[in-house]
Amino acid sequence: MMVLSGALCFRMKDSALKVLYLHNNQLLAGGLHAEKVIKGEEISVVPNRALDASLSPVILGVQGGSQCLSCGTEKGPILKLEPVNIMELYLGAKESKSFTFYRRDMGLTSSFESAAYPGWFLCTSPEADQPVRLTQIPEDPAWDAPITDFYFQQCD
């Protein structure tokens, strides 16, 4: 398997086309601000080499990979940004499950399930400019259910 020299760059939008962007050290999903279109955060992505590659385990970072999305190590999953270098996680031999998401491809969109908390997925709120968080997918989702499908496109 080839070893990456740096993280891959992706941009993420939810299926309602809200872009993921950073504000006050929080990852939010939104669109227009004062008539300016937000370009969206560059998301640094590396595979987690310690976990089963067939499950597409990925580690997601922001700010050039200097901070990574983590589900924490508490009793319940809490999504937060931790000041950990994405390449250290990539090159390290640890499982780093709290930083890992299984990317599930669903045609045009993908969902991201926490490796540390199975059944919990990255999601956005239907309202704009709310934090990205984790949710369990309900049996019969209501119209205002969290959005768990994302467009995941490599940066130009």
Curated annotation (Swiss-Prot):
CDD domains per record: beta-trefoil_IL36RA
Posttranslational mods: Removal of N-terminal methionine is necessary for full antagonistic activity.
Functional description taken from the UniProt entry: Inhibits the activity of interleukin-36 (IL36A,IL36B and IL36G) by binding to receptor IL1RL2/IL-36R and preventing its association with the coreceptor IL1RAP for signaling. Part of the IL-36 signaling system that is thought to be present in epithelial barriers and to take part in local inflammatory response; similar to the IL-1 system with which it shares the coreceptor. Proposed to play a role in skin inflammation. May be involved in the innate immune response to fungal pathogens. May activate an anti-inflammatory signaling pathway by recruiting SIGIRR.
Family the UniProt entry places it in: Belongs to the IL-1 family.
Cystine connections: 9-155
GO molecular function: cytokine activity; interleukin-1 receptor binding
Note from the entry: Bioactive (processed) recombinant IL36RN inhibits effects of IL-36 when used in 100- 1000-fold molar excess.
Gene deletion effect: In combination with transgenic IL36A exacerbates skin abnormalities (acanthosis, hyperkeratosis, presence of a mixed inflammatory cell infiltrate and increased cytokine and chemokine expression).
One Gene Ontology term, aspect cellular component: cytoplasm
Matching InterPro entries: IL-1_CS (IPR020877), IL-1_fam (IPR000975), IL-1RA/IL-36 (IPR003297), IL1/FGF (IPR008996)
Tissue specificity remark: Highly abundant in embryonic tissue and tissues containing epithelial cells.
Compartments where located: Cytoplasm; Secreted
Quaternary structure and partners: Interacts with cargo receptor TMED10; the interaction mediates the translocation from the cytoplasm into the ERGIC (endoplasmic reticulum-Golgi intermediate compartment) and thereby secretion.
Pfam families: IL1
Record flagged with keyword Cytoplasm: yes
Gene for this chain: Il36rn
Biological process annotations from GO: antifungal humoral response; inflammatory response; innate immune response; negative regulation of cytokine-mediated signaling pathway; negative regulation of interleukin-17 production; negative regulation of interleukin-6 production; negative regulation of type II interferon production
Keywords assigned: Cytokine, Cytoplasm, Disulfide bond, Immunity, Innate immunity, Secreted
Protein name (database record): Interleukin-36 receptor antagonist protein
SUPFAM superfamilies per record: Cytokine
